[in-house]
Amino acid sequence: MLKEFKEFALKGNVMDLAVGVVIGGAFGKIVTSLVNDIITPLIGLLLGKVDFSGLFINLSGVPYKTIAEAKTAHAATLNYGLFLNSVIDFVIIAFSIFIVIKQLNRFKRKQEVEQAPVTTKECPHCISAIPVKATRCPNCTSMLETKGTALAHE
């Protein structure tokens, strides 16, 4: 059983998945920092010096200045500023993944076009498209050259 697990764990797909998860986690941290430390402060500055992470609605009757004070008092709050940060975070990650997948698909399509086998050739006599394996043109009935042998036009 240990041998089977070792074979499974060392397969290319599992290793690729592991690398993807690690890189995805690191990328998520970078995007979260970008959102929390750069984007939302800039948006907040444009909207009147508002820090999104501090925006909340207090559902208890007691006033609190910060979310931390409300949490310490175990008060019920709706932390919509933190939710907005999470939404912005999600949009950036989703857009980044969209761009990466779009590029991968573009490269894959280009590679498929380059690798597509040639299935037709041009008849040298009537210039029509014919199958590569044809020995006689179905349009002008000319005999065609085959590997190493030149056949005359009838």
From Swiss-Prot:
A GO MF label: mechanosensitive monoatomic ion channel activity
Pfam families tied to this protein: MscL (PF01741)
Keywords for the protein's UniProt record, in alphabetical order: Cell membrane, Ion channel, Ion transport, Membrane, Transmembrane, Transmembrane helix, Transport
Cellular localisation: Cell membrane
Membrane topology: Multi-pass membrane protein
GO terms for cellular component: plasma membrane
TM region(s), chain numbering: 14-34, 38-58, 81-101
Disulfide cross-links: none
InterPro entries: Mechanosensitive_channel_CS, MS_channel, MSC/AndL, MscL_channel
Domain of life: Bacteria
Assembly behavior: Homopentamer.
Function (record text): Channel that opens in response to stretch forces in the membrane lipid bilayer. May participate in the regulation of osmotic pressure changes within the cell.
Family: Belongs to the MscL family.
Protein known as: Large-conductance mechanosensitive channel
Species for this entry: Brevibacillus brevis (strain 47 / JCM 6285 / NBRC 100599)
